[in-house]
Amino acid sequence: MSELTQLAQQEKKQTYNFNKLQKRLRRNVGNAIADFGMIEDGDKVMVCLSGGKDSYTLLDILLNLQQSAPIKFDIVAVNLDQKQPGFPEHVLPEYLESIGVDYKIVQENTYGIVKEKIPEGKTTCSLCSRLRRGILYRTATELGATKIALGHHRDDMLATLFLNMFYGGKIKSMPPKLISDDGKQIVIRPLAYCKEKDIEKYAIAKEFPIIPCNLCGSQPNLQRQVVKEMLNTWDRQYPGRLETMFSAMQNITLSHMCDPKLFDFKGIKHGQLIDGIEGDTAFDEERITPMQFEDEDQTDFSNKEMINFKEVN
């Protein structure tokens, strides 16, 4: 076999693998949008673009779905320039103009505020997050955006669940859709069903101009990084565990938790049968059927159906 033929076959295989990856991401995003009612007809979606792999992928997939969705919605990309030293201000405008999407660059010196308020070596995430949230909410109002799309994915949601359990004493994660405290903004996370490793592969293949974050990426031993490494270890040692855990987040039996605010334990009386509540049978050893997980390299995309988002080419 000639070298030219080998190169052609290799390129064909790479194209095939990329197409499978892209379709998997589009399907996962489409299903999340449909399952949680994230985007409706006439919406203006403000995609928050940080310059990282997640938000680039989010914008790219939403733009693709926009072309084939059965509903009409607008997209505007927004980047918050936090005035970090050395931040390449030209990168995002050049990229956004090259793909022809409406965008707005918001310039606020949150970097200076965080550095002034937080002692050296301490975690800046909490203050930085609050500052960014307020600015993005204000910007959404100014732009007339009806939805704010963030780039958090499945692995972020799982990490947040464990962070809250380990350090906050709560069973709480990132919701795929939420409303702000004042009821004026709806935040959505269309990548909720997407694996981080899929997003990483996609970002590399698309050659997105990634911009590192000096505020959080340079801080060692963050609690989130510790939890993330724990999840990555589980994923390597026990394939399918993360999928099972994420499935558990969608299958909660409140009567077998311990929160009296969510379930009326005091109201349980003798002779009472309540539909939908598992009693002592839930203590029986359950017959666990192994979950069927999608083989990333053997996925059949001949059926390109997506819930509410049909036929993406």
UniProtKB/Swiss-Prot annotation:
Cofactor note: Binds 1 [4Fe-4S] cluster per subunit. The cluster is chelated by three Cys residues, the fourth Fe has a free coordination site that may bind a sulfur atom transferred from the persulfide of IscS.
Cofactor(s) needed: Mg(2+); [4Fe-4S] cluster
CDD domains associated with the record: TtcA-like
Annotated positions binding [4Fe-4S] cluster: C125, C128, C216
Enzyme Commission number(s) from the entry: 2.8.1.-
Annotated Pfam families: ATP_bind_3
Listed GO CC annotations: cytosol
Catalytically driven reaction(s): cytidine(32) in tRNA + S-sulfanyl-L-cysteinyl-[cysteine desulfurase] + AH2 + ATP = 2-thiocytidine(32) in tRNA + L-cysteinyl-[cysteine desulfurase] + A + AMP + diphosphate + H(+)
Pathway: tRNA modification
GO molecular function, one term: tRNA binding
Keywords recorded for this protein, A-Z: 4Fe-4S, ATP-binding, Cytoplasm, Iron, Iron-sulfur, Magnesium, Metal-binding, Nucleotide-binding, RNA-binding, Transferase, tRNA processing, tRNA-binding
Cell compartment(s), UniProt: Cytoplasm
Motif position, PP-loop motif: 50-55
Self-association state and partner proteins as the record states: Homodimer.
Described purpose of this protein according to its UniProt entry: Catalyzes the ATP-dependent 2-thiolation of cytidine in position 32 of tRNA, to form 2-thiocytidine (s(2)C32). The sulfur atoms are provided by the cysteine/cysteine desulfurase (IscS) system.
Sequence similarity: Belongs to the TtcA family.
The protein's name in its UniProt record: tRNA-cytidine(32) 2-sulfurtransferase
Native organism: Haemophilus influenzae (strain ATCC 51907 / DSM 11121 / KW20 / Rd)
Protein encoded by which gene: ttcA
